[in-house]
């Protein structure tokens, strides 16, 4: 009986609960000062055209806290860190399940690990 109940409960869970969400960042390991950094976030397990969905870019400089950079929402609303907004552009390609961040005029102070996240 316990096995049957577990199976029935599993079958009644909506399929979106069982899907695995993954996000993977790609881009150059290094850029030179004054160059433009272009990073791509390729994701699966959700659709950025679904109401309420959003993807953010964050970074973490060595030995420092996380810093939020930018966010794009399902309806193409865009939000940027006030201190970096003149250097950042975020865009999405829902057909490829990708979000792209570009950051102009790179500087050594921009040294960090860059992450995308569904937040």
Swiss-Prot record:
Modified residues (Pyrrolidone carboxylic acid): 20
Any GO CC annotation of this UniProt entry: plasma membrane
GO BP terms: immunoglobulin mediated immune response
Record's keyword terms, sorted: Adaptive immunity, Cell membrane, Disulfide bond, Immunity, Immunoglobulin, Immunoglobulin domain, Membrane, Pyrrolidone carboxylic acid, Secreted, Signal
Region (Framework-2): 55-71
Annotated localization: Secreted; Cell membrane
InterPro entries xrefs: Ig-like_dom, Ig-like_dom_sf, Ig-like_fold, Ig_V-set, IgHV
Region (Complementarity-determining-3): 117-119
Spans annotated as Complementarity-determining-2: 72-78
Annotated segments matching region Complementarity-determining-1: 45-54
Segment forming the signal sequence: 1-19
Chain segments carrying region Framework-3: 79-116
Pfam family, one: V-set
Single GO MF descriptor: antigen binding
Coiled coil is among the record's keywords: no
Location of region: Framework-1: 20-44
Domain Ig-like: 20-119
Disulfide bonds: 41-116
Domain of life of the source: Eukaryota
Function, in words: V region of the variable domain of immunoglobulin heavy chains that participates in the antigen recognition. Immunoglobulins, also known as antibodies, are membrane-bound or secreted glycoproteins produced by B lymphocytes. In the recognition phase of humoral immunity, the membrane-bound immunoglobulins serve as receptors which, upon binding of a specific antigen, trigger the clonal expansion and differentiation of B lymphocytes into immunoglobulins-secreting plasma cells.
Assembly: Immunoglobulins are composed of two identical heavy chains and two identical light chains; disulfide-linked.
Protein name: Immunoglobulin heavy variable 2-70D
């Amino acid at each position: 009986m316990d096995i049957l109940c577990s199976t029935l409960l599993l079958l009644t869970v909506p399929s979106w609960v069982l899907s695995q969400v993954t996000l993977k960042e790609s881009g150059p390991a290094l850029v030179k000062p004054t160059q433009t950094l272009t990073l791509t976030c390729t994701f699966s397990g959700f659709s950025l055209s679904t109401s309420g969905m959003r993807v953010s870019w964050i970074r973490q400089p060595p030995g420092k806290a996380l810093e939020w950079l930018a966010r794009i929402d399902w309806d193409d609303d865009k939000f940027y860190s006030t201190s970096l907004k003149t250097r950042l552009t975020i865009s999405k390609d829902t057909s490829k399940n990708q979000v792209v961040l570009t950051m102009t005029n790179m500087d050594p102070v921009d040294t960090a690990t860059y992450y995308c996240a569904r937040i």
